[in-house]
Amino acid sequence: MQRVLEEIAQERARQEHLLSIGKFTHTCASIDGMSEHARMTVLTEEYLEADELARAMLRLARGVNDRDELTELRKELVQIAAVAAAWVESIDTRIELSEG
């Protein structure tokens, strides 16, 4: 479990790095400039990429674990978790700011 959480943290750091070099204008952790709808769009996009991979794996061979496909699916799931974590960060920051 710890390894997975570390990978999610690394993905969050990667997202923030991409923001810092101008690839993104915001991340889901941004407290302004990004609506809840936009955050949901980002999360949904990541989910759909993972869903597409999972469905492709099922079509190719039910019950057969293709290592490359599983590795790619795992990568997408870590990205989903990181986007969700970023959104939680934004919510926490906004709650803290409203308290004080």
In which residue ranges do the predicted regions lie?
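Flexible "arm" and connector segments at domain edges
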Residues: 1-100
